[in-house]
Amino acid sequence: MENAHTKTVEEVLGYFGVNESTGLSLEQVKKLKERWGSNELPAEEGKTLLELVIEQFEDLLVRILLLAACISFVLAWFEEGEETITAFVEPFVILLILVANAIVGVWQERNAENAIEALKEYEPEMGKVYRQDRKSVQRIKAKDIVPGDIVEIAVGDKVPADIRLTSIKSTTLRVDQSILTGESVSVIKHTDPVPDPRAVNQDKKNMLFSGTNIAAGKAMGVVVATGVNTEIGKIRDEMVATEQERTPLQQKLDEFGEQLSKVISLICIAVWIINIGHFNDPVHGGSWIRGAIYYFKIAVALAVAAIPEGLPAVITTCLALGTRRMAKKNAIVRSLPSVETLGCTSVICSDKTGTLTTNQMSVCRMFILDKVEGDTCSLNEFTITGSTYAPIGEVHKDDKPVKCHQYDGLVELATICALCNDSALDYNEAKGVYKKFGEATETALTCLVEKMNVFDTELKGLSKIERANACNSVIKQLMKKEFTLEFSRDRKSMSVYCTPNKPSRTSMSKMFVKGAPEGVIDRCTHIRVGSTKVPMTPGVKQKVMSVIREWGSGSDTLRCLALATHDNPLRREEMNLEDSANFIKYETNLTFVGCVGMLDPPRIEVASSVKLCRQAGIRVIMITGDNKGTAVAICRRIGIFGQDEDVTSKAFTGREFDELSPSAQRDACLNARCFARVEPSHKSKIVEFLQSFDEITAMTGDGVNDAPALKKSEIGIAMGSGTAVAKTASEMVLADDNFSTIVAAVEEGRAIYNNMKQFIRYLISSNVGEVVCIFLTAALGFPEALIPVQLLWVNLVTDGLPATALGFNPPDLDIMNKPPRNPKEPLISGWLFFRYLAIGCYVGAATVGAAAWWFIAADGGPRVSFYQLSHFLQCKDDNPDFEGVDCAIFESPYPMTMALSVLVTIEMCNALNSLSENQSLLRMPPWENIWLVGSICLSMSLHFLILYVEPLPLIFQITPLNLTQWLMVLKISLPVILMDETLKFVARNYLEPAILE
């Protein structure tokens, strides 16, 4: 039923053709069940294990590697001679890499539990309904409830469907609907129509929503929506429709993969075509097909060389290390790629309650009457320090601490706060914090009593558990609470009837009242001044109300409560406590004692974090279900708005936002910094508009209602105290619910990206070198300098360790003084591309040169001519060009060993070059990153391992080197440092002075 909240009870019952006392007939139930289906959320069809595995192979680079492995396997199958076993090593290693990669990918996907499934935990198992087949209420499975059913709910129940209340069977009905609205204070419900068809869920006071909890009271209602038609069902549909965006890093790596695959394909084809003339060379036995296959193998080796196989593992390791560092700062990252996305966050949309504020109501101001003369009066105003539930704070008057027992009015005010109250403070030993037990508003009053200590109770030596309610206990020993007149909407107040624990002639029964100021003060005939009471005159009333209005609408927008007493109440037996309509009669002729103003105060550290965001070019937007006045006041206190800043077109309510045209809504999202009284759908819409401006949005949330927006935004941030649905829909969970933790995580994300750029460039320059090496050997007609199994070893192990260590580079000092980077900015641009191409060409040329040196110039080498080396495939005994040359020398492992050793050593030098993008090694020495030094030592040790420990040399087709050969390796390798230092010097001084580190 649409807009059931706007209809009267009779209209709703008439729509379903149902009687409140008897319920639906079985025939009606059957028809309605057929029409609307079961009252449950459909289960989400998850991906099968096979689908998840296949997904891991959709990446282009992975497919190229898979193809290379398959081709290598086929070629190895037909291999003859000694190389039969070693030929299988390459496809086996490639497949091993791909399998490991797929396992990690599948595990991560399985680990990200389905947020849609988590919604089901809010579905109650049973419900209580009235139906015509039974005279009394019956318990049935909640999934069998249909629209039109008459449902009974009571305290502790979970609401089984969306229900329009028809009658309330208790004084009040309080509902905790925080999972849907995000607001922690329970809501008082009624049965009157709410005429506004566009009312937000918070304002539909005559509706109960599926999955919410009854905090107090008992009521009956008619079901108006079930299953996916409920509010929680709409959230589920929105989540199903929300596609997960790929992170900027994933998009970059996808683009890089596509470009690389095109380059690889071109080079492979080019190498094959260049050598068509050699297909018939004698070494291939004159067989054109065998020659074609030989060069096809070289093309496959090229593909293996060009792909940085170690990159996925290094990126995963770097992100995992980043998540550990973030966890220490209370940011628990659930999705690894999002660590890097945090670095380019340009907008943070934050909840107010609990994130920007403490979510711990505290009284910060109060007043009592000082003097009254006719229509004029003066007040004693006090401020209270301390912004949490900890019973630690002072009462100040004119900025100086005061002793509360010196003021009779404060003693009485504390007595009302302690007795007209059902809450308590509770010390949580495990977490070492004070928590509320009961309503937030009442806990604030309990905490105030502890800070006031009106009877000067000795508090030293008490444990924290004893300290929690020490001062309240003293007051409760003096008077005993007999009964409570519950809060009701008509009088907007509640009261308690108390009798003295030690009766005497002077002490008598009293009623203590607290409630909304306008309601309570209208029923006050007198006013307390010190220990006397004087009549309340219109002038005094006006003065008191003007102060209360000022507190409620000023810079703090405090929530005010008036406190009063009834000095001569009726006796209990004279009251009718069954009918709450009579309560207002018993709460008249009151004496006004004072007023307290409370708020959910901003966290102390938030203002500095908001300032840091401004420096870093990040816009902070507050999004809250609270009213606009309170939201703007908090924004001013924490620096989102200036103290006197005009908030027109910068702060909107959900209603105001809906009334704008789509283009005006888009403009609003470009400038706004505060959205109040919003619904979940607004959050998703705001994220969409921000994304249309290419903003990278971090969105916080804790309720079920926030899940679609958390899923839609680039970075969904759930609260540690939030619902399971919010957590599973998010990329990150704040263990401490603190806004400042988000800012610390953004800083970490920026540092991680900078380090990632360094190691990605490092790995790519290595791959460029390998490609140049293989291309040169093929183009010059030299014997193979590097084979695929060696390239895999270098790409995975030797390069992988220093690349991982580059993830430990210290962050720049000015990292949060720069604007967010453009997510579309390429990983490697212009000058840097030239730099890494130049270095790569040197790496390739040096590797080929090292192999050629052994053939042409080495003392222990064959000393063949350049012509003989470049035409080695024509070598045979009857060829005069190769007279005196043993053709087997061209298959010696020495040139390969020289090439591999030069490649490894140059890469270690290159790792040192990557310590900083533009800073010289003289300014930033290697020991700035001790992990890098350690990883270089480990990589070289592993290289010695495969050189000198059997049977590894056989697998890698290499052989140990002597000292002369090692000295030549160093002579060829070390110039790469000088070369990069020169390029850095040019960059620093001529090309990119703005990037000076």
From Swiss-Prot:
Q: Name one GO cellular component term.
A: membrane
Residues noted as binding Ca(2+) 2 in the record, renumbered to the chain: 767, 770, 798-799, 907
Q: Map out region (Interaction with HAX1) in residue numbers.
A: 575-594
Question: Which is a GO BP term held by this UniProt record?
Answer: autophagosome assembly
Mind telling me which residue stretches traverse the membrane in this protein?
A: 49-69, 90-110, 254-273, 296-313, 757-776, 787-807, 828-850, 897-916, 930-948, 964-984
Residues with 3'-nitrotyrosine modification: 294-295
What does the record give as the active site?
Answer: 351
What keywords would UniProt list here?
Answer: ATP-binding, Calcium, Calcium transport, Disulfide bond, Endoplasmic reticulum, Ion transport, Magnesium, Membrane, Metal-binding, Nitration, Nucleotide-binding, Phosphoprotein, Sarcoplasmic reticulum, Translocase, Transmembrane, Transmembrane helix, Transport
Query: Which E.C. number(s) belong to this protein?
Result: 7.2.2.10
Location of region: Interaction with PLN: 787-807, 931-942
Reaction(s) catalysed by this chain, per the record, are: Ca(2+)(in) + ATP + H2O = Ca(2+)(out) + ADP + phosphate + H(+)
Name the positions where ATP binds.
353, 442, 489, 514, 559, 624-626, 677, 683, 705
Positions annotated to bind Ca(2+) 1? 304-305, 307, 309, 795, 799
Q: Which cysteines are joined by disulfide bonds?
A: 875-887
A single GO molecular-function term is:
ATP hydrolysis activity
Activity regulation remarks: Has different conformational states with differential Ca2+ affinity. The E1 conformational state (active form) shows high Ca(2+) affinity, while the E2 state exhibits low Ca(2+) affinity. Binding of ATP allosterically increases its affinity for subsequent binding of Ca2+. Reversibly inhibited by phospholamban (PLN) at low calcium concentrations. PLN inhibits ATP2A2 Ca(2+) affinity by disrupting its allosteric activation by ATP. Inhibited by sarcolipin (SLN) and myoregulin (MRLN). The inhibition is blocked by VMP1.
Give me the ranges of the annotated region Interaction with TMEM64 and PDIA3: 788-997
Record localization: Endoplasmic reticulum membrane; Sarcoplasmic reticulum membrane
**Residues where Phosphoserine occurs?**
38, 531, 580, 661, 663
Which residue ranges are assigned to the Cytoplasmic compartment in the record's topology? Answer: 1-48, 111-253, 314-756, 808-827, 917-929, 985-997
Phosphothreonine found at: 441
Q: Which residues lie on this side of the membrane: Lumenal?
A: 70-89, 274-295, 777-786, 851-896, 949-963
State how it assembles.
Interacts with sarcolipin (SLN); the interaction inhibits ATP2A2 Ca(2+) affinity. Interacts with phospholamban (PLN); the interaction inhibits ATP2A2 Ca(2+) affinity. Interacts with myoregulin (MRLN). Interacts with ARLN and ERLN; the interactions inhibit ATP2A2 Ca(2+) affinity. Interacts with STRIT1/DWORF; the interaction results in activation of ATP2A2. Interacts with the monomeric forms of SLN, PLN, ARLN, ERLN and STRI1/DWORF. Interacts with HAX1. Interacts with S100A8 and S100A9. Interacts with SLC35G1 and STIM1. Interacts with TMEM203. Interacts with TMEM64 and PDIA3.
Domain observations = Ca(2+) and ATP binding cause major rearrangements of the cytoplasmic and transmembrane domains. According to the E1-E2 model, Ca(2+) binding to the cytosolic domain of the pump in the high-affinity E1 conformation is followed by the ATP-dependent phosphorylation of the active site Asp, giving rise to E1P. A conformational change of the phosphoenzyme gives rise to the low-affinity E2P state that exposes the Ca(2+) ions to the lumenal side and promotes Ca(2+) release. Dephosphorylation of the active site Asp mediates the subsequent return to the E1 conformation.
Q: State the protein's name.
A: Sarcoplasmic/endoplasmic reticulum calcium ATPase 2
Q: Which gene encodes it?
A: ATP2A2
